[in-house]
Amino acid sequence: MKNFSLFILLAFALLFASCGDLDKPKHLKAIAQMDKSLDSMHIVLKENRLDTLAGIQIAANALLTRIKTYYVSDTIDMELGKKMNQFKRIMKSIKPKKGRGANKNAESNEIIITDRSIGNGFAVVHNGLKAEEETLIALKRDIENGNGRRDKYAEYIKFEQQKVYQLQQLLKAYVDHKNKTIKDFNEIYAELNAFSLKLMEKK
């Protein structure tokens, strides 16, 4: 009787293992698709990197200094004040804040961006892609070698697919925000820069 029970247990173990092996190609295919998505996101992120961040900051500081130095008026120019405030808001959207970035929700593992600047947005997506790549490498290795809880592989795959989707949404938000912010910056900078240069000419 004991031998028969042992036989039944071995049979179930073999059946369980064979089922896991049957699902292996499907799991590996899902990981390959996620890897492909990450590669595509890396390309888009690289194409939308703001390499002129330091140059923009220098130009903005010079513009603000000229206006502060040469603008003198006995009355308050409300229109100029609005444009200056708009310009400063745009600069806050471009320059990353020190010590702030992205945190993770402990319950859902969702990435929460605490600093919406362009500089930080790039870092959040870049670091997220790198972390996800490392996670998928480890998961792929476990599935190939049959390590860990085989019955949880499908659940792990689904969880990582959700993270990849979130990274896609973060990347799209970063690109949209970057494009709009730079467009707004160029428009207001051109106007205020021309104004500041005229002030210099009058002196």
What residues fall within each predicted segment?
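Short, flexible helical or helix-coil boundary motifs
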Residues: I8, Y71, M91-I94, K98, ...
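Non-transmembrane, amphipathic alpha-helical segments
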Residues: D23-K26, A30-Q33, L45-N48, T52, ...
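Subset-of-secretome marker
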Residues: Q33, S37, N61-K68, V72, ...
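Sec-dependent bacterial lipoprotein signal peptides
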Residues: M1-C19
